[in-house]
Structure formats: structure tokens, C-alpha cells
Regions:
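Glycan-recognition and catalytic cores of secretory/periplasmic carbohydrate-active enzymes
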Residues: 1-189
């Protein structure tokens, strides 16, 4: 709703990135939404989702990495444990572009290209465990979010995800007119 009020594309990007994560990482083959993903991978908190500056430089090259890391607040000290960084946007794209003396369009190209490269690299890592329990209430919230995103963005895949998840919950999580709260391993309770 922040995007609808402000028309600031930053908020639209946050919605799109969040829903892309949910669709990619947190959606069951049947269409329901899983409940959680662990923070630990390989016994280390945040390892799957965090980056050392050197990793980014190796993947993107020095010039693109410098722009990418400035946009996402990556520093040698890191903002997480052991010098690792969680990517997060510190300032508006246009403001960062102005400081770096590049056009907003150029910076956006570097950011989008870098996101794809880092996502591909991250998918080569050992992923954290996922709690594959499907909770009815949380699915209701996600169905609502997907439907709302479709209304605002007009992207058909959000509507499709909402419909598939709603169908899944109605077919698998309602028995004798009663809502069942959890679904796991083919069983609803």
C-alpha cells in the first residue's frame, strides 16, 4: 500500500522482490506457501544470504561491484557477523547515482545485473532448511498479498499464485466445513 500512496517505485520493487522470493523459495509444488526458512546453513547463521565484499568483487568485477556494494551498503566491516553483509538499500537510487556520478539508469542496470549474478551464485550454496509445514492463516495472508499485488501491478503470475494457493487450501485444509490449521506430508490437521 506504500507504493499506492506514494507512487515511489522503490516500494513496488520491494513488493516484487519479496514476492519473487516467496514464489521461488517458499511455495510448495501443490501451490501452498511454506511456513518458514531457517536462518542457518552449514551450521552458520546467515551464511546462505550474506556476502563478503571479496565475493561480490569476484562475481561482478571491481567497477560494477563498487557500485553494487555502495547501493546495498556492503562494507569491509560488514553489517552482520564475521565481516559478512546482508544486502540492504541505504538510500534512494537517484541519490546514490548522483553521489557516484553515474546516471540512475546506469546504476539500475548494474544493480539488476548484479542481483541476477548473486542469485545464481547463492543458488550454488547449501540452502538453509525449510519448514515445509503449510499454515492456513499464513496462507490466507499470502493469498491476500498476491491478489493485492495483482490488483496494483497487473502481473498475472501473482493472480495465478493466489488462485492456486486458495484452491490448495480449500481442497486440502477444509474437512466437513471445518478449517484445518496445518498441512504437512499430505495430512491436514
Amino acid at each position: 500500500e506504500a507504493y499506492q500512496v506514494t507512487q515511489d517505485n522503490f516500494y513496488l520493487q520491494v513488493v516484487e522482490d519479496t514476492l519473487a522470493y516467496v514464489l521461488r523459495e517458499m511455495t510448495s509444488p501443490e501451490g501452498g506457501f511454506y511456513s518458514a526458512q531457517d536462518a542457518d546453513s552449514e551450521g552458520e547463521e546467515g551464511k546462505y544470504f550474506t556476502w563478503f565484499p571479496e565475493e561480490i568483487e569476484e562475481l561482478l568485477g571491481e567497477q560494477d561491484a563498487a557500485l553494487f556494494m555502495r547501493y546495498y551498503g556492503v562494507s569491509p566491516e560488514g553489517n552482520f557477523e564475521h565481516g559478512r553483509s546482508i544486502l540492504h538499500v541505504e538510500n534512494e537510487l537517484a541519490d546514490i547515482a548522483r553521489v557516484l556520478q553515474v546516471s540512475a539508469g546506469q546504476l539500475l542496470e548494474v544493480i539488476e545485473r548484479g542481483q541476477k549474478v548473486l542469485l545464481a551464485a547463492r543458488q550454488q550454496r547449501i540452502a538453509p532448511e525449510r519448514d515445509d509445514k503449510i499454515l492456513l492463516a499464513w496462507n490466507g495472508l499470502m493469498i491476500s498479498a498476491m491478489a493485492r499485488a495483482y490488483q496494483v501491478c497487473g502481473e498475472e503470475h501473482y493472480l495465478k499464485a493466489a488462485v492456486v494457493a486458495a484452491d490448495f487450501t480449500l481442497e486440502n485444509m477444509v474437512r466437513d466445513g471445518q478449517l484445518l490449521h496445518t498441512y504437512k506430508d499430505g495430512q491436514a490437521r
